[in-house]
Structure formats: structure tokens, C-alpha cells
Design a protein with these regions (language model features):
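Bacterial N-terminal signal peptides
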Residues: 1-12
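A structural boundary/capping signal
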Residues: 14-336
Length: 336
């Protein structure tokens, strides 16, 4: 298999420490909460991840043609299906999907997919959309595993999403056990490799916040977190909190959603108090109560995540990741 380890510590954006640049606000035909309710209902009804992801993406960018994106995915799945030999097991079928995505051939119309080296920290929400990935053929640790899962489901594989700190990958059921598939490098990895590379604590493993195969509901929460990213810069922070509460009702262990809650309270604190600078006039009793409430809730949600085993991303990991990107880019330039 090709590629290097490309699990960016910010690919699944850690809401408290990085922010996508603001984009133009687009009027939505549906409220964020209504969208979330519809998406979670789709999961309960057994809809596949492709339909759920495209519904989320449509909220992010209303210009997206849902039918066109789903048609492209169906066509890809059918091309792969023609190459699956009779009796192929789960890992053999998975390998064919990875080959279709990564190896240049007439089979995939010479259109290979690769990691987006221009957005190594996944800061641009647009780059996490399936429509963007299908158009540019460059993805990240959100769009790449979701497309892999979408194709796997359409080909009858028992697949699901799983997470590591700030990262999403795929698990496939093979001979009664779950195997990890790393979509950003088109290969397989062990749980221990993920633990080492992303510094997963024993406490996090004990609390099962990472590496576990996610249910259909839990996978839909991972996909829907993009709506929280959208609301961070274009919506009200209270709406962001309401959406986060709805997602936590589906996956109480979603650390990423907890971080969004903590960050939303920080933004409220910043907007209502910190941005106004020091004042010679003391805060009113009501304002002081509000200030303390926002401060307390901000700390509570980050403390909640930490109590389950989440740890703040390490700056030295970010630096090593950027060095990996530079080496990868240099290698591509030499060979290209």
C-alpha cells in the first residue's frame, strides 16, 4: 500500500484550539436543529453513511447536488464490484476498494485519490465535503474514511467508523474480528499503532472514547460534527450548544462534541465580556453571575473530556506532522 502516516492532530478539528476562517453566511432552508433531527432519524432508519454525509454536507453548502454526489459513489461501487472475485473475503474486498482509490489504472479512469497536502491540518471545512473530495481527488481524515466506508457498505462489507484523537478511520469486520483501515494512507494499522502515534492514554482506552467500532448512531454523530464547525463561525453559540446536546444524547462519549461545548462557552464569554476590554464600571450582579456561569461551563466541559482520557494536542506532534508533510511534498516533487 502507498502513503505515509497522515493522521493530522487537527484533521478532525479540535474546536478549542483552531478555527476555520469565517465564510459567508448562507441562508438555510432548514434550521440546524431540524437538520440534526433529520440526520439522526436517517441513522435510526438504517440509511447508509453516504446519504447521511451528503445531508450534512448539504447543510454546510446548500449548492451541493445530493443526487449527483450519491450517483457518483454508486457508480464507483459498481465499478469495484465488477473486479471482486467469487468468494473474496472482507479484507480482499477492502483491498480492492483501496486499490481502486489509490492506484492509477483504466479501471478508475486514471483518477486516483490522495491526501490533501495543501491543507494538512484540515482547517477548511469545504475540504471535508464529499463533493469536494470527489471533485479534487484530495481529501483528509474526514472525507477519506467516509468515502471508504460508503463504498464498503455498498459492497456489503461490515464496516464502521472509529476515532483516535483528532482523527477518523475505518474498521472492517473480518473473520469475527475488527481490522483497522487507514484511509489517508490506503493501508491497515493496529490499535497499538494508533495508540502510539496519537498518544492515547490508558484512561481513554478504559473509558472507550477512542478506537472502538462505532454504532450507526455514533458514526452519524462523527459525521454531523461538521455542523458544529459550521456554527462556530457562522451561527449563534447557543445554537451550537443545542446541537451539541442533541449529538451527545446519541453518543455520550463523543469527546469532540464535548470540546465543542466547552469552546462555545468560551466564545460566549469572549463575545459578551472579554472583547469589551477592561472597564472602570464594576459588573452588575446579574452580569457577574452570567460571567461566572460561562466560565464555569467552559471549564466543566473540558474537564469532562479530560476525565475520560482526552488530552490537549501536543505542539511537538504538530511540528513532527508538518515535517512529515514537507518530506512527503519533497518526495512527490522529485518523482513528479
Amino acid at each position: 500500500m502507498i502513503g505515509i502516516w497522515l493522521a493530522s492532530l487537527a484533521c478532525q478539528t479540535t474546536a478549542a484550539y483552531s478555527a476555520a476562517p469565517p465564510s459567508a453566511t448562507v441562508l438555510q432552508a432548514e434550521t440546524p436543529l431540524a437538520t440534526i433531527d433529520r440526520i439522526l432519524l436517517m441513522a435510526d432508519q438504517g440509511r447508509d453513511i453516504a446519504a447521511i454525509k451528503v445531508a450534512v454536507d448539504k447543510f454546510i453548502d446548500p449548492r451541493i447536488n445530493e443526487a449527483s454526489v450519491l450517483r457518483q459513489i454508486n457508480e464507483m461501487a459498481e465499478r469495484i464490484r465488477t473486479k471482486i472475485p467469487h468468494g473474496a473475503d472482507a479484507m480482499e474486498r477492502t483491498a480492492l476498494i483501496l486499490k481502486y482509490l489509490s492506484e492509477d489504472s483504466e479501471w478508475n479512469q486514471h483518477q486516483t485519490f490522495s491526501y490533501d497536502l495543501d491543507d494538512p491540518f484540515g482547517t477548511k471545512l469545504e475540504n471535508k465535503l464529499l463533493s469536494t473530495y470527489l471533485r479534487t481527488r484530495r481529501g483528509n481524515c474526514v472525507s477519506m474514511p467516509i468515502l471508504l466506508l460508503a463504498l464498503g457498505q455498498k459492497l456489503g462489507l461490515e464496516m464502521t467508523l472509529a476515532t483516535a484523537p483528532s482523527h477518523v478511520f475505518v474498521k472492517v469486520r473480518h473473520n469475527g474480528t475488527w481490522k483497522n483501515v487507514e484511509a489517508t494512507s490506503f493501508g491497515v494499522m493496529t490499535d497499538e499503532s494508533y495508540r502510539t502515534k496519537t498518544h492515547i492514554s490508558d484512561l481513554a482506552i478504559a473509558n472507550q472514547i477512542y478506537l472502538r467500532p462505532l454504532s450507526r448512531r455514533e458514526s452519524s454523530v462523527v459525521v454531523a460534527e461538521a455542523i458544529l464547525e459550521k456554527l462556530k463561525t457562522t451561527g449563534s453559540q447557543q445554537t451550537r450548544l443545542d446541537v451539541a446536546d442533541k449529538l451527545l444524547s446519541y453518543d455520550p462519549k463523543s469527546v469532540q462534541t464535548m470540546l465543542h461545548k466547552g469552546n462555545a462557552y468560551f466564545h460566549m464569554l469572549k463575545n459578551e465580556f472579554l472583547d469589551h476590554g477592561p472597564s472602570s464600571t464594576p459588573l452588575s450582579t446579574q452580569s457577574m453571575l452570567r460571567y461566572r456561569h460561562l466560565q464555569r461551563e467552559n471549564r466543566r466541559w473540558f474537564s469532562r473530556a479530560e476525565s475520560l482520557g482526552w488530552r490537549e494536542p501536543r505542539t511537538d506532534d504538530d511540528q513532527r506532522y508538518l515535517e512529515d508533510i514537507r518530506r512527503k511534498r519533497g518526495s512527490l516533487e522529485e518523482n513528479g
